[in-house]
Amino acid sequence: MKENVFNKEAFIEDVKENVKNLYRKTLDEASQQEIFQAVSYTVKDVIIDDWLATQKAFDKQDPKMVYYMSMEFLMGRALGNNMINLKMYKEVKEALEEIGLNLDEIEDQEPDPALGNGGLGRLAACFMESLATLGYAAYGCGIRYRYGMFKQKIKDGFQVEVPDNWLKNGYPFELRRPEYSYEVKFGGYVRAEVTEEGKTRFIQENYQSVLAVPYDMPIVGYGNHVVDTLMIWDAEPMECFELDSFDKGDYHKAVEQENLARNLVEVLYPNDNHIAGKELRLKQQYFFVSA
């Protein structure tokens, strides 16, 4: 694949342009979080060139594709890791220093993607990066948790668990792919119907459904311009809001579909020491394998 040549002046201009387009600010006015977003989008532009080239190469070669399915991927922060794998970390650091920016402070603005918890998630992440570094055609498949597990705080000498809202500022290293969305159905019943050709067809009725919407995250191989894909699925309501129910005063039913979708992807491994938790885990796993 074509070798990327780092252009310091162009990189700095792209960062400034991203700050302007994303936040309607100059670089001097931007916060550290906003600068992190702008730098990340600039790096992602470099990644996307390799991502497209990788896809074209795989389409031409038609290799066997590896699909790594896991309920969790503990990926870690992406900005620094991606720059290292692109072999541009030193150049970016020096370019940012020229305009008075500290790369270490910028990297500290990135939240850990709350897509995993422990050994299983870290193993999945390592496998995906190894596959990309070795040049294998691979997809990771998981769930886009909104809060993952939790953040730990110490209050009055005791651990307190609070939600880890890693998506509150948006995440620059993901691409929403609504064109690949699928309907996932829950509940109801199945009836059999015989067609005119004499074939039996099974039809699911009186079900609840959500829309499984994929987000692509790049998995950058080290120094080889190969970019594989981690596809994580979010759950969205088929109909966000039932105005008729709302007008009748049934406010709970008005947002029932939205609540069903949100519950599926709120947290990794929801508490299952009660019936509702067991049902949610089963629905979560069914949603994943269906998508």
What residues fall within each predicted segment?
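A conserved ligand/cofactor-binding region detector
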Residues: 1-291
